[in-house]
């Protein structure tokens, strides 16, 4: 017979597992796992599917913008996805790369970051002339 401590631990793990599974769709969970494994091809396949299943989740277009399009320097698509996330809910707090931040603040931070990165690369190229 199981001890009370083991039953308590098992019950907590079961509740935690149910909570985690109810938070995200299977598609989004698959995409996040692919990102964690640096399988960006698989992530780019699953993130659009996740957006179809969870059209009201601004975190998904944010993640796709940052992890797929920004990495590929596809700035137009990155901005389009940022705009989509802002239209869904600019005030919602989402998890981006382990940080919890509002969509509006994340968009501002990442646009500024990538703009500065491109600007600095341009300056470096200019100095080589």
Show the residue positions of the predicted features.
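C-terminal motif of bacterial Sec signal peptides marking the signal peptidase cleavage site
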Residues: 19-22
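Alpha-helical solenoid repeat scaffolds, predominantly canonical TPR units
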Residues: 34, 46, 77, 81-84, ...
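Conserved structural position within tetratricopeptide repeats
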Residues: 48-53, 84-87
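Residue-level detector of the short coil/turn that links helix A to helix B
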Residues: 38, 72-73, 129
């Amino acid at each position: 017979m199981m001890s009370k401590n083991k039953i308590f631990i098992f019950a907590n793990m079961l509740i935690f597992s149910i909570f985690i599974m109810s938070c995200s769709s299977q598609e989004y969970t698959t995409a996040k796992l692919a990102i964690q494994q640096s399988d960006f091809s698989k992530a780019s396949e699953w993130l659009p599917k996740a957006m179809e299943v969870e059209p009201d989740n601004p975190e998904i277009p944010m993640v796709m913008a940052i992890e797929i399009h920004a990495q590929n320097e596809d700035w137009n698509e990155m901005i389009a996805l940022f705009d989509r996330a802002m239209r869904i809910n600019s005030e919602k707090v989402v998890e981006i790369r382990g940080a919890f931040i509002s969509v509006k603040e994340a968009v501002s931070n990442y646009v500024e970051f990538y703009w500065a990165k491109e600007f600095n690369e341009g300056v470096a190229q200019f100095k080589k002339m």
